[in-house]
Amino acid sequence: MTTERTALFAGSFDPFTVGHESIVARGLEIFDRIVIGVGVNAQKRAWMTPEERVSAIRELYAGEPRVSVMQFGCLTAQAAAECGARFLLRGVR
C-alpha cells in the first residue's frame, strides 16, 4: 500500500481558469500528486472538446511532474479509483 497522497480534481474545465490553477497550486501544498480529471458530459454544451481541454491543461502543467491529467466519463468516485486517488480536491463556489 502506497502512502502517497493523491487527489483527484474533477470538473468540466471549459475553460480551465486562473481560479482552477489556484486550487491546484494550493492542493500541491497538501497532496503529493494531483490528477486533474476532465469530465465528459455529452448533455452539456462545451466551448472546447474534451481532448482540447486535456491537451491545454497538460501543456500548462508540463513542467510539474506531480500533476497529471485524465479524461473521464464515469462517476467521479470511479475516476478516483481508476487513478488511485484517495482524496478529492474541491474549491468553494
State where each predicted segment sits.
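Nucleotidyltransferase catalytic core that binds NTPs
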Residues: 1-93
